[in-house]
Amino acid sequence: MSELAKFFIEVAEKWQRRWAEAKVFEPSPQPGRPKFFITAAYPYPNGTIHIGHGRTYLVADVMARFRRHLGYNVLFPMAFHYTGTPILTIAEVIAAGDKAVIEEYKEIYGVSDDDIKKMGDPLYLAQYFHRRSKEAMIKFGLGIDWSREFTTIDPEYQRFIQWQFEKLRKRGLIVRGRHPVGWCPRHQMPVGAHDTKDDKEPEIGQWTLIYFVDGEGLVYPTATLRPETVPGVTNIWINPDAEYVVAEFEGRKMVLSKDAAYRLSFQGNVKVIREARGREFVGRRVLNPVTGEWVPVYEAKFVDPKVGTGVVMSVPAHAPYDYAALRDMGEVKLIPLIRVEGYGEYPAKEVVERMGIKSQTDPALEEATREVYSAEYTRGVVREDVVDRIAPHLPEPARSMVRAVFKLYFAGRPVKEAREFISKWLAEAGLGGVMYDIMNKPVYCRCGTEIVVKVLEDQWFINYGERGWKQLARQLVEEMAIIPQEAKAQFLATIDWLDKRACARTRGLGTPLPWSQGWVIESLSDSTIYMAFYTVIKKIRALGLRPEQLTEEFWDYVFLGQGSAAEVAKRIGVDPAALEEIRREFDYWYPLDSRNSGKDLIPNHLTFFIFNHVAIFPREKWPRQIVANGWVLREGEKMSKSKRNVLPLDKAVALYGPDPLRATLAIAAEVEQDLDFRDAEARRNSQQLMSIYNLVQRLAQSAVEREETWLDKWLISEVAHVLERAREAYEKVRLRQAAVELLYNAEAVFSQYLSMVDKPSKSAVEAAKAWVVALEPIVPHFAEELWQILGGEGFAATAPWPKLSPDPAALLAKRYVDMLIEDVKNIPAYKAGAKRVAIYVNGNYQWLRAAVGKDVKAAIEAGAPPQLAKRLVDFAKSMGEEVRGLVERVEQFDEYAALQSYKRYVEKALGVPVDIYKADDPQAPDLGGKKKAALPLKPGIFIEVG
């Protein structure tokens, strides 16, 4: 631990004790006072939280602290998520003696051998990391109300979740049936993002299978996402070196890759008859079920046996990979199917040749494929003459009947409509089927097993596909604030594609499904409205309510206002006043004002949060805002246990101290951006905080009581502007911008001020207090220490947001002086070796005010001599926008007095003595005839050269 880190840790521990003693972060309802209720996603205690968690919690903490300064009654609570498999899986792996995982936990988290031995018990593991993570949050300086802490296996919480699920079931939003889910073959259970390594949500997609048949009756089920292109198939591809099988599936003998047969076995009955290499099937001919054409089976090593069925159809007119491969073979045959504005008959050929792609191994084929597929899907229309290729092998009248259907629903239709039609038609005609797959594979369970898709029977699902529910969810997304705004489109897209989602499983910690024994509610389903539970758990415990008293009627009254307190209280055996007190607590804090989490939770938790709120709560209790921050990298790399580069939050605090760490996580990137945490930057920020500390000490120790000067007024005005910009940044959750303003720009202003004055004034101390209050949300312990040094009363954490008023005249004086210094330095005589500078001030400020934004006539009418008026107007036009604005706002300005006040500053900047004269003073010497050259804010300058 460095000396700097030690200093910051000692400061932090001091103020953490004092906050806890004063219960600064344990608010109670205060009717009539505005409230701000913010939550961040609670962590799984399957490891100590790391700096990625720390960033999310810091954003929430900064928002909470800022609102407290604005006068809000702020609630920021925290809990721990024990539910599901993340904890159980790690405990099982450790119990099994997995050396790699055990070494990871020792090296990354510093777990002792004794504790490792006990971690085969999932509850011990959870409680160990729960304690470590909570300690890390406290050391990090999060202003959390720990009096509301709970875990998701607490009996009170389980009663709450059972109430939630009964509500969803009674509204028809929980169903039982057949549906594809992500599945762990080892644990025989459905999985979601929180059950997988790296929290990767299994994305389930659907292939259309098209049954091509060879002369022996073997079926080659090509898997495609573009079934509308089947009339243009010229061949099919098989990987000659891959492992294939002949298997019975859906009453047919099929050729499948061995891997595909395994994956399909979770979706239906698959019986492997024999194994084979792919080359056994190369050279055969198969019948296209739509066109009746016999097409060859070609070998292609680019076919991935782990994708689809390992059997691929080739459409070279509309698939760049197929065109390039067949061109390499000299076997190109092009059949046009789709018209797209801006492309010719054969889009794939056109794009491949335009991009200069030379072979089927060219990486540019990926880009070519994206272009063609996107253009055809969004703007493509199936050609009318495609009908002539349909079913020529069928006898009449079947041929005409099929063609009539295709003419009506396929030819001339947009690609999207044609795709839907032909997928359905193939299945109904027995010429094709469906296969589900993990489209973002590989996805691994936390146990290390690769996830597959299983079609479950009699599984419980939350039906996020229900249309009315989707519409309410969209309505909330449109009404609420989402930061960053660009994330709104991702929420709407997620709402669109969400369908049934498995909500219960048969293993893991959690809440039993209330109406069906043997099922446990899964972790992404029991964590959607728990923000409401924070508002009441403290009162439930304080009033001594037992879990069995937390009935459906209890929750209906507390959260929905249904029934009367007297009747409900009588039935559950509590005091009606106690029940009303719990209801008032919820009613005061809800709705949630801001939900903070990582952007990776948009496709699951955050969208489920939206769905469940609109399903259960009345509109006035719907959440108001979501903030989704980016990831945290470390030294340019993604953090992962396998790389051993995960930085636990408690270790980071010990390494840098909490406030330098907070400053770095705030300043390194804006909220929506991914943040690259670098050691060098953390150390720079630590040094910057020490510079601020030394500056504030100097200011406090040397300040004197005296009349305010131009310099004092300038300091207050500059600080007022910095604080206004910081306030605007905080309000928009632009933490980086706020941190730059407060940690660097404000420090530069105070440093310059101290360089200009002999002794700082007491008003400078007041300006520093204002600065410290604005700093507090980012570096709270450090701010408290500075607040104490400056003589602030109470806590900086609870001080009101400062009200400093900028003085436009003081700002104008400083801008004027800086312009003068620049003018002098640009004069050749100064550069040649100035010995002394004489400055002649024209005090007719009103002439300049008249000239700004006006014309020569206005300047003359204000009293300016005609021979000067044109120069005045030209000078006014040359001033920067800020200075022009200040001149328009400042009615009276004593240029001579301002310059006298800044004389020491000017002499220091120029490095020579400076004499200041009034241009209209007859007693002043007219050196070089510069009296008449002076204009308001543009003095005459004479330089004596030595």
From Swiss-Prot:
A motif ('KMSKS' region) lies at residues 638-642. One of its GO terms (cellular component) is cytoplasm. The keyword Ligase applies. A motif ('HIGH' region) lies at residues 43-53. Its EC number is 6.1.1.4. Keywords: Aminoacyl-tRNA synthetase, ATP-binding, Cytoplasm, Ligase, Nucleotide-binding, Protein biosynthesis. The keyword Nucleotide-binding applies. InterPro entries: aa-tRNA-synth_I_CS, aa-tRNA-synth_Ia, Leu-tRNA-lgase_arc, Leu-tRNA-synth_Ia_arc/euk, M/V/L/I-tRNA-synth_anticd-bd, Rossmann-like_a/b/a_fold, tRNAsynth_Ia_anticodon-bd, Val/Leu/Ile-tRNA-synth_edit. It is found in: Cytoplasm. Its main location: cytoplasm. It comes from the Archaea. One of its GO terms (biological process) is leucyl-tRNA aminoacylation. ATP binds at K641. PANTHER family: LEUCINE--TRNA LIGASE, CYTOPLASMIC (PTHR45794:SF1), LEUCYL-TRNA SYNTHETASE (PTHR45794). This is Leucine--tRNA ligase. It comes from Pyrobaculum calidifontis (strain DSM 21063 / JCM 11548 / VA1).
